Amino acid sequence: ASDVYKRQLVFTLEVLMVDLSMASLLPILISCVTATCFSYILMGEKSLFDFTLTDPWELDRVPACILLGVFCGFVSLYFMRTMSACEGFFAKLKQYPYVKLLFGGIILSSLIFLFPSLYGEGYSAVNILLKGRTEADWDMVMSNSLFYGHSQLLVLYIGLVTFTKVFATSATNGSGGCGGTFAPSLFIGGFAGFFFARIWNIYKLGVYIPEQNFTLMGMAGVMTGVMHAPLTGIFLIAELTGGYLLFIPLMIVCICSLLTISIFESHSIYALRLAREGKLLTHHIDKAALTLMGMQSVVEKDYHPVSPDLPMGKLVSEISRSNNNFLPVVNQAGVLLGIIDITRI
């Protein structure tokens, strides 16, 4: 991931690492440096997204940034819940691999036919949103779709693409492909941010907000919500686009997005499945110890149950046979009635 995005140390520490030690930090540093060097050699130093700040951030746009953060939080919730539901659907088809492949292929091909922007990782479409200004640019976003040539339907197209991208990703992952979650969260965030800004400006809900800037902030907001990683969202988006002058609005959007998603989901998309299975290791030492502990290894099974009407002589015999300090008293149905503490006899 460092090879592609050139900013993955923060992601590793914030999302993947449960505990940090020098022994675990050194391999991470070495792998990040190596991957980044090869990336510069093979692809150059150009940013993944082409962004130029032409409209600096202003203080009167704070309310819009807060609302965008809340909106990104709900988009992140939709992303996570829909992905989880689709994974469950495809998991039921595990015994029928060809049926699963057929379902995934039909869903994905149908969505790409209707919305060509869904093809691939979609970075080219996001780049158009980041630097587009004219109707010709918006037509490029809708190129080869049924919406092409109808720039007045741009908002509808952007909204539908945002809505359906999750299904395209889920169909890819579920049918055996590699759709990932990192790149789709960037794509959905960019389109969601542009959709929010365009609706805001059309209905004049407040001061004018630059759509390109909010496309960028939407990427950070959705990534933060999906991964529960605000530092990753802030630094990664700033690094990918060179938009360091938008640090304050990026912070506002990421914080609001995280606060919103945390109300509904306490774990990131990477930790959600482990948490549901009870296998998630956390920074809480006691919880981590309980997670790693095998209950079968601590449950005592070597005991000799006795009946409540057992004569005293036989009870003494049972006590001599027992390797524990207690004898469970059970009835004929095997229901526990009490415990005899040998140390108190």
Locations of regions flagged by a protein language model:
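Helix-loop-helix hairpins and the membrane-proximal interhelical loops
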Residues: 85-210
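Hydrophobic core segments of alpha-helical transmembrane domains in multi-pass membrane transport
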Residues: 31-38, 65-74, 101-114, 162-169, ...
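Juxtamembrane interface elements at the cytosolic ends of transmembrane helices
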Residues: 6-10, 46-47, 70-90, 119-123
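Re-entrant/interfacial helical elements at transmembrane boundaries that shape
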Residues: 8-15, 49-50, 123-128, 173-193, ...
